[in-house]
Amino acid sequence: VKVEVDTSIRLVPEATGKLLAWASGLEGSTNTYLEQTKALAQKLGAYYRPDGLTEIGFWVPGLIRDVLHEREIYLEVFTPQEPIDWQAKEQSIKFKRDRLHLEQQGEYIWGVVSGMRAGNREQAGSFYWLRYVDQAERLRTIRDLLPISLPYGIFAPAELYDIDRLQANRTDLDYLERTAKSGNSKRKPPRVGDPKNVLEIHVGTASPEGTIAGLTRIYQEISTKIEQGQPLTPTEQNYVGYDAIELLPMEPTIEYRDEYSPESEFFAFTTGEDSRENDNDIVEIELFKPNTQDWGYDVPILGSSTTNPALLSSLRPDEVVDFIATLHNFPTYPIQLIYDLVYGHADNQSELLIAREFMKGPNMYGQDLNHQLPMVRAILLEMQRRKINTIGDEQYCSGDSRA
């Protein structure tokens, strides 16, 4: 099977060469193997650079032995040709599909690409994943493990997002500047003080909306009342008086499905998914707003760097930052945020989504993760780093389904 490649979105050879040289240079460095893998993990996923180019990296252990011909591995990009209504429960959207080959280097695939659109609060970005044809001539998918935005769930392609713009426009920059300064020069990075009392919240049941935006609304209304000297209702009083809020896990969760299949039920092709020719570059996709919520511990690991879209009213990462900024700017004193992160196990559904090298074997919750493998450990640490970069002041890691 020959895969024709559309060149509307292009690989930038010079910039890609620099990325490859950097990655290969790590092997000759004096860093430990774990330090090397941590550096590589920071380049995985898709990063929209200030110069308008997009850096892309995938870890693909064992992929080459599953592919009939090396050049049948390609990046597939879907760019919306009309606005997406983030509130709509169901809609049909036309996407322009582009395909291009990236560069393979050992267990990694790298590229610097021009022409991809970055998403932001107002607009949808390009969606992307890797595709390949296996030795049985079946079309297979490799998804981004560390996306910034995953609006249509774990089985759908990730969305390229302008994370630098998101961070630059947040409304708690004064708080971040203050807490970035430490009176103790030996403490790097600076640390905020330990909270004395913590309110644990399950996002899906803590507001009528069942979303992060619903929590933001509640705390903004409470803030307004405090600033105006108005009394709080008995219900509102339950949300205040705490130094920190700990949110039960917000990572993308498993999806309840009719069949044990790797196909997305929220990002469903109505035309052209299996077309491998160049003459049909417009595909129509039925989008369904994700609605899978639970206690948060049934995780597939994929996408743990971002938020379960079922908890996002807007399906935009900005919604989380808006909530954090509301807490940091609370009128009485800043309220810290604590993330509950689950890296001790993965649900069995993860076997459809991530490389088998991630798993060590079954346990009572699904699959044990292979923490002893340096690249797995490095990716989990990178997921944590990206999550904390939204400025959850602390994190709590669950070693099992609930520690």
Can you say where each PLM-predicted feature lies in the sequence?
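The feature marks proteins involved in alpha-glucan
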Residues: 1-67, 94, 104, 108-110, ...
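Extended low-complexity, serine/threonine- and proline-enriched intrinsically disordered segments
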Residues: 58, 64-89, 132
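Short, flexible loop/turn elements at secondary-structure junctions
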Residues: 60-62, 79, 117, 134, ...
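Extended charged low-complexity segments that act as oligomerization/scaffolding linkers
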Residues: 80-89, 161-180, 379-382, 403
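Solvent-exposed serine/threonine-rich low-complexity stretches and specific carbohydrate-binding patches
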Residues: 85-104
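Acidic/polar, low-complexity linker and loop regions
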Residues: 91-94, 193, 292, 300
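Short, acidic/polar
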Residues: 211-237, 376-385
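Substrate-binding/active-site clefts of carbohydrate-active enzymes
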Residues: 234-243, 248-403
